[in-house]
Design a protein with these regions (language model features):
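Amphipathic, interaction-prone secondary-structure segments
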Residues: 23-50, 139-164
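Conserved binding-pocket/active-site segment within a compact domain
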Residues: 121-183
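Intrinsically disordered, low-complexity regulatory segments enriched in Ser/Thr/Pro
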Residues: 44-69, 163-188
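Short amphipathic C-terminal alpha-helix that caps PH/PH-like domains
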Residues: 74, 78, 194-197
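Short Lys/Arg-enriched alpha/beta "domain-start" segment
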Residues: 1-34, 40, 70, 77-134
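Helix-rich interaction surfaces within compact, conserved domain-sized segments
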Residues: 183-200
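Conserved small/polar residues in nucleotide/adenosyl-binding loops
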Residues: 206-208
Length: 208
């Protein structure tokens, strides 16, 4: 078993320690005797109530989820907050770096730039991909070609901005977080979620 698998099993064990009825109430989860259900970035997932394993819907079938970032984000979302009632999102958006002391968080620029280049010249396609994933187009902010509120988890959204490139400026992506986001997720998990969201947009874009 490699380190990733060990951490996934640690996440399962943590999830299984929680009162699932309280999680159902807290997050408004659909459920039955065997599974809890939630949507993550436009895809339906279910969590086995007995062993904590996570599966995702593929048509009429359910498939074991082996994406480490997806699995750990779902576990963290359900298990991060010790509050019985979560604070409502404020609509006050900020960069992820605002949550930590200056200089203490790793830069995501090279990672995000990879997706910005892939989206270059495809404003309409990126728009349709965001809509396919449940995104709501918002008023343009700071001159961005696209501004979307993306519902990524139950009652939890992030704000995506995209500026297309031209002869003078390269394309740019900026992801903004509600100021109470760390009541829902640990700081490190925001990086997993960011990657999962941009990957999902790119995959949707390819199929448009």
């Amino acid at each position: 078993m490699d380190n990733y698998e060990k951490q996934v099993y640690t996440g399962r064990e943590l999830f299984l320690k929680y009162d699932q009825d309280k999680l159902i109430k807290k997050y408004g989860l659909k459920h039955d005797e065997e599974y809890l259900y939630l949507k993550y970035i436009g895809t339906e997932y279910r969590i086995n109530r007995r062993n904590g394993a996570i599966e995702y819907a593929t048509g009429e079938e359910w498939t074991d989820c082996r994406e480490y970032t997806v699995v750990m984000t779902i576990y963290d979302f359900l298990c991060c907050s010790g509050q019985e009632i979560l604070p409502p999102l404020t609509g006050q958006w900020q960069p992820v770096g605002r949550f930590v002391t200056a200089g203490s968080s790793p830069s995501t620029d090279p990672f995000v730039e990879k997706y910005a280049r892939a989206f270059f010249g495809k404003v309409e396609e990126v728009k349709q991909a965001c809509i396919c994933l449940g995104g709501k187009q918002m008023q343009r902010l700071a001159g961005a070609d696209l501004t979307f509120e993306m519902p990524v988890l139950p009652e939890f959204s992030v704000l995506l901005q995209f500026w297309d490139g031209d002869e003078e400026f390269p394309p740019k992506i900026l992801l903004l977080w509600d100021k109470v986001s760390l009541s829902y997720l640990h700081f490190e998990t925001t990086y997993y979620l960011q990657g999962d969201l941009l990957k999902a947009i790119l995959l949707s874009l390819i199929h448009i």
